[in-house]
């Protein structure tokens, strides 16, 4: 999805430098795999080996009320169908887990239709073309886009999937993170909406997550003073010690509101909003005149059984003449080459450190997605299928 950019082919030496930066950025002690007992939930066992001509996929069984549970999805296996003219078959190697996945299984209006009962769970992914009857895709080509929770995806000529040039020495998972839609999301929010100026104060909620960690580092590269909000002392230390944030607020601490006030003595000029709820109210109350709010997500309400209440401090946007703008990354694919070129350059220069959490095993998908809402991941959460 726009990952096939100038940054995707940075050249041998540059690729090695980018790869080295990303490798040291992976948080090994917070990388959850199927073999790691610290993984945030019970592992799924007993599926066994499967035929190469079969396709395992997770279908939506029922819409959850609140948290995703064991009855939300069902594992289904089918024969890989024969391709028709104009189709290609992709082997899915990596699957992206994102808060928006939770929104897509609600039966409510959104920017994409909800996943239907009995349909393959929608998700971004990265894979390789293994068969093709269309000139759009060639065998051996890497592709990125909406591949879904399945091991093989049949792609039509109109599929929301694009080729991506994976540079030698760089993990393909990077193209689902900082060098993919995650990076583009952060870049649009900072460059087009937040527009931080040197010396301004930028607050990023869910700052240790996939988008927030990149957004904060982009703002820091612009010369802003960056305050990150994260859950727990370990994540807060990560923000200040590894990512270069100027201050961090632990939203799990009893005194988080006092921490926010202390970290923003001159008010807040830019809010990169990923969470909503009480955190957003506290941020809105500290906005400066002319502040900009980039509304990227509202993860605090995605598992809510009932609609969450609206912001209580909304009136301060009026008083401070602030601007609030929501945005969806799907509207900005055309900006991907520009964004990826800049982000790759910042990684190479040591000014941006990508983070990722890797879960190994296709069967872990229904459990792994809850890591997003339990605060068990750092940076981009991806599942390695094979």
Predicted segments with their positions:
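Mid-domain Rossmann-like dinucleotide-binding core that forms the NAD(H)/NADP(H) cofactor-binding site
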Residues: 176-254
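Short amphipathic alpha-helix with an adjacent loop that forms part of the alpha/beta core around
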Residues: 256-265
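Glycine-rich phosphate-binding loop and adjacent beta-alpha segment
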Residues: 278-352, 385-386
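Short, glycine/polar-rich helix-capping loops at beta-to-alpha or helix-loop-helix junctions
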Residues: 150-151, 231-239, 309-314
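Glycine-rich beta-strand-centered segment in the early N-terminal region that forms part
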Residues: 80-97, 105-149
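NAD(P)H dinucleotide-binding glycine-rich loop of Rossmann-like/cofactor-binding domains
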Residues: 121-128, 138-206, 351
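C-terminal hydrophobic helical "lid"/dimerization subdomain
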Residues: 48, 52-53, 330-386
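Residue-level detector of structural "landmarks"
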Residues: 6-9, 14-21, 30
């Amino acid at each position: 999805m726009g990952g096939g950019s100038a940054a995707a082919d940075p050249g041998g030496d540059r690729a090695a430098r980018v790869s080295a930066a990303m490798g040291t950025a992976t948080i090994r002690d917070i990388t959850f795999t199927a073999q790691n007992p610290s993984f945030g939930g019970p592992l799924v066992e007993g599926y066994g080996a499967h035929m190469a001509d079969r396709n395992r996929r997770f279908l939506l069984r029922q819409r959850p009320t609140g948290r995703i549970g064991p009855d939300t999805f069902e594992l289904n296996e089918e024969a890989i169908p024969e391709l028709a003219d104009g189709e290609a078959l992709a082997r899915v190697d990596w699957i992206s887990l994102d808060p928006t996945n939770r929104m897509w299984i609600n039966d409510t209006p959104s920017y994409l239709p909800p996943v239907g009962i009995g349909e393959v769970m929608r998700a971004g992914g990265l894979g390789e073309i293994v068969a093709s009857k269309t000139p759009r895709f060639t065998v051996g080509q890497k592709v990125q886009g909406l591949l879904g929770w399945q091991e093989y995806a049949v792609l039509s000529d109109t599929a929301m999937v694009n080729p991506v040039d994976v540079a030698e020495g760089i993990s393909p998972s990077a193209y689902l993170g900082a060098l993919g839609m995650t990076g583009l999301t952060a870049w649009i929010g900072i460059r087009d909406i937040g527009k931080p100026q040197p010396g301004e104060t930028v607050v990023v909620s869910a700052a240790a997550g996939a988008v927030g960690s990149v957004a904060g580092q982009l703002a820091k590269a612009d010369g802003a003073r960056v305050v990150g909000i994260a859950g727990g002392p370990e994540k807060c230390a990560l923000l200040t010690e590894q990512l270069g944030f100027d201050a961090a607020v632990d939203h799990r601490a009893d005194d988080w509101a006092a921490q926010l006030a202390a970290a923003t003595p001159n008010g807040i000029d830019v809010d990169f909003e990923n969470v909503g709820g009480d955190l957003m109210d506290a941020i809105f109350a500290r906005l400066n005149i002319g502040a900009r709010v980039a509304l990227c997500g509202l993860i605090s309400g995605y598992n809510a059984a009932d609609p969450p209440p609206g912001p209580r401090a909304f009136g301060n946007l009026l008083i401070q003449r602030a601007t609030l703008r929501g945005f969806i990354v799907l509207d900005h694919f055309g900006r991907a080459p520009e964004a990826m070129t800049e982000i790759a350059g910042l990684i190479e220069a040591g000014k941006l450190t990508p983070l990722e959490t890797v879960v190994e095993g296709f069967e872990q998908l229904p459990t792994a997605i809850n890591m997003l809402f339990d605060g068990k991941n750092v940076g981009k959460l991806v599942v390695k299928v094979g």
